[in-house]
Design a protein with these regions (language model features):
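Alpha-helix-loop-beta-strand connector modules within alpha/beta enzyme cores
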Residues: 48-72, 112-134, 141, 148-160, ...
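Short, flexible/disordered intra-domain loops and linkers
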Residues: 18-23, 180-188
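Glycine-rich, proline-tolerant flexible connector loops at the mouths of alpha/beta enzymes
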Residues: 33-53, 98-116, 138, 172-185
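Glycine-rich phosphate-binding active-site loops on the catalytic face of alpha/beta enzymes
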Residues: 11, 69-70, 80, 92-107, ...
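Catalytic cores of alpha/beta
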Residues: 78-92, 142-153, 196-204, 212-228
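Hydrophobic faces of well-ordered beta-strands that scaffold small-molecule active sites
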Residues: 2-14, 44-46, 65-72, 98-100, ...
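Glycine-rich anion/phosphate-binding loops
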Residues: 74-89, 109-118
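Conserved N-terminal beta1-alpha1 strand-loop-helix module at the mouth
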Residues: 1-80, 92, 153
Length: 248
């Protein structure tokens, strides 16, 4: 197993969030793209305004690194029309994979139809362009029962509308990494929520994201069913893997 092929190397902060200039933020994105090429990561996950720049860097290198972006991030409560428009723009710019934030607040209020419609139409859009769709459920905002229900919901939408052959093209993703929790409760992927998602969303793919910062945690997430790891600590994970391999 080559752990680099599980990694969605991620940088999603805006310049304002990072407290730096737009130029400095762009430099961070460019550095991540070059790192992804050097370490053979699966994907670079960035804001859509950087897709063109990163795509050019990857293309010139000849690397197989994919480019992903987030849609309706981080709250997921925009209208369906806005979600679709944002996704269409990202596809046009050249994104290979789109990570949609599900309208989890609507789901929590019992508005299942809202989630069903947006997930169905977003999958249809992605599949029509041969793109991968990932749905961020924001597990930290949900109870265990809600995690089970929404994971099963996405699974059933795929199997009933798009067939099991497309299960490999749709992910359920744990977290944005931006959700604010109380009392230092983890806001990202935990072993418990990845187990729940995996048990209830398979044969769909699973992405563990938020708080996965070391090699051991990444390995554990993979053993629990994660097919992809979203992390801003890809280099640290890779370096530890290389160190571990040299120890044998």
């Amino acid at each position: 197993m080559k752990i680099s092929h599980y990694l969605d190397a991620t940088y999603l902060k805006t310049a304002i969030q990072a407290g730096i200039t737009e130029k400095e933020n762009l430099e961070k994105v460019v550095a991540l793209a070059k790192e992804a090429i050097s370490y053979d990561y699966k994907l670079v996950m960035i804001r859509s305004n950087y897709i063109t720049t990163v795509k050019k860097i990857v293309s010139i290198s000849g690397a197989k690194v994919l480019i992903g972006t987030v849609i309706d991030f981080p709250c997921g409560d925009s209208s369906l029309k806005q979600k679709i428009q944002e996704a269409e723009k990202a596809i046009k710019l050249g994104a290979d994979e789109l990570d949609f934030v599900v309208n989890y607040n609507a789901f929590k209020k019992g508005n299942i139809d809202v989630v069903t419609e947006e997930v169905t139409l977003c999958i249809a859009l992605c599949l029509s362009h041969q793109k991968i769709a990932k749905f961020i459920i924001e597990a930290a905002a949900l109870s265990n029962e809600e995690i089970i229900v929404i994971s099963q919901l996405v699974k059933h939408i795929v199997l009933e509308n798009f067939g099991e052959e497309n299960a490999k093209n749709v992910f359920v993703k744990s977290s944005t990494g931006f959700f604010k929790t109380e009392r230092e409760i983890p806001n990202g992927a935990t072993f418990e929520n990845i187990m729940l998602i995996s048990k209830n969303a398979k044969p769909l793919k699973i992405k563990a994201a938020g708080g996965v910062r070391d090699y051991e945690t990444a390995l554990k997430m993979i053993s629990l069913g994660a097919d992809r790891i979203g992390t801003s600590s890809s280099k640290e994970i890779i370096n530890k893997e290389q160190h571990s391999n040299q120890s044998y």
